């Protein structure tokens, strides 16, 4: 766990990563029923109460083991996706990253930009030197995100994770190390 971790705003060009709010729950409910998101990110939330609980868990950084952001367009701040740094381990100096983008916002580079922003922020302010990204081999879009966000492919994990279809898929494991792909420039962070 990392002490004194609190929600921040991160901005880069057209993308803003912001703290979660209760107003995000209806969009989360719709997004987490998208078959693509359910397949690669787990089960759907059944109702608005579950979506509200999902948002509250991501908004609460008090345990210091995760940092979760709502992905939005800088103009308007409407919710377009999610990016989370989780399993933050300051002893080992590593963390994992995950994300999803709503169907209407896919194909515009939002996920890669969001992942890059979170990595730069994490390396600038957290005691982590390594961030891992894993995705099912069949999820080619996540491979493109990893490449664009400066991650290095490390290998294949055989039958390593049970995805939303109930099947254990092989995964590709990527990492980004402190010092890979530039510095923390271009990240504007402010406390929520």
Spans of features found by a protein language model:
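Conserved active-site tyrosine of GNAT-family acetyltransferases
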Residues: 146, 151, 174
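Glycine-centered small-residue hotspots that permit tight backbone geometry or close packing
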Residues: 65-68, 98, 109, 114, ...
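Conserved catalytic-core motifs of GNAT/GCN5-like acyltransferases
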Residues: 20, 132-134, 152-169
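GNAT-family acyltransferases
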Residues: 1-104, 167-192
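Conserved acetyl-CoA-binding loop-helix of GNAT-fold acetyltransferases
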Residues: 99-101, 107-121, 140-148
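Conserved beta-strand edge residues that scaffold enzyme active sites
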Residues: 46, 69, 136-137, 160
């Amino acid at each position: 766990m990392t002490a004194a971790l609190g929600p921040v705003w991160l901005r880069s060009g057209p993308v803003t990563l912001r703290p979660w709010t209760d107003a995000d729950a209806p969009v989360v409910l719709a997004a987490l029923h998208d078959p693509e998101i359910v397949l690669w990110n787990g089960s759907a939330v059944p109702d608005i109460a579950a979506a509200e609980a999902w948002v509250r868990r991501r908004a609460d950084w008090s345990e210091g083991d995760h940092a979760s952001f709502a992905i939005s367009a800088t103009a308007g701040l409407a919710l377009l996706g999610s990016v989370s740094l989780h399993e933050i381990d300051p002893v080992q100096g590593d963390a994992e990253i995950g994300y999803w983008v709503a169907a209407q916002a896919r194909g515009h580079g939002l996920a890669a930009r969001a992942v890059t922003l979170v990595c730069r922020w994490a390396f600038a302010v957290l005691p982590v030197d390594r961030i891992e990204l894993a995705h099912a081999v069949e999820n080619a879009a996540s491979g493109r995100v990893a490449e664009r966000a400066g991650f290095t492919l490390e290998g294949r994990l055989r039958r390593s994770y049970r995805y939303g279809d109930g099947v254990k898929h092989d995964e590709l494991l990527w990492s980004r190390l402190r010092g890979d792909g530039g510095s923390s420039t271009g990240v504007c962070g402010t406390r929520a």
